[in-house]
Amino acid sequence: MSKSTIKFVRLSPTKTRLIAKEIQGMNAEFALATLEFTPNRGAKYIANAILSAVANGGFEPNEVIVKSCRVDAGPVLKRFRPRARGTASRIRKPTSHIMVEVSKPSKEA
């Protein structure tokens, strides 16, 4: 089993979790092919995390499965935008931490 972590990615964790749930349990090679054609910004970062986890373990993408893919919330950058009558509204810019674990499939008889 090998792990990979990408921290402080400027993505919403809520939106990125949708992709992470889809690829959990998939073969790593199939997951990478799926992510390549997923029209979401988070797919690129998750694909990089999978490639990194595969390389960390010294595996090939076709011989491992994505055991777990977790997206946690990081710190939120807070910015302000001027509004009418001298007021200001807060803009939240969320960040994410992406954790991926890959391992060889277990031999089930």
From Swiss-Prot:
Entry GO terms, CC: cytosolic large ribosomal subunit
Superkingdom of the source species: Bacteria
Keywords linked to the UniProt accession: Ribonucleoprotein, Ribosomal protein, RNA-binding, rRNA-binding
Bias (Basic residues) ranges: 84-95
Keyword Transferase on entry: no
GO biological process, one term: translation
Molecular-function annotations in GO: rRNA binding; structural constituent of ribosome
Annotated stretches, region: Disordered: 84-109
InterPro entries for this protein: Ribosomal_uL22, Ribosomal_uL22_bac/chlpt-type, Ribosomal_uL22_bac/org-type, Ribosomal_uL22_sf
Record family assignment: Belongs to the universal ribosomal protein uL22 family.
Function: This protein binds specifically to 23S rRNA; its binding is stimulated by other ribosomal proteins, e.g. L4, L17, and L20. It is important during the early stages of 50S assembly. It makes multiple contacts with different domains of the 23S rRNA in the assembled 50S subunit and ribosome. The globular domain of the protein is located near the polypeptide exit tunnel on the outside of the subunit, while an extended beta-hairpin is found that lines the wall of the exit tunnel in the center of the 70S ribosome.
Matches recorded under HAMAP family: Ribosomal_uL22_B
Subunit structure as annotated in this protein's UniProt entry: Part of the 50S ribosomal subunit.
Protein name according to UniProt: Large ribosomal subunit protein uL22
Annotated source species: Campylobacter hominis (strain ATCC BAA-381 / DSM 21671 / CCUG 45161 / LMG 19568 / NCTC 13146 / CH001A)
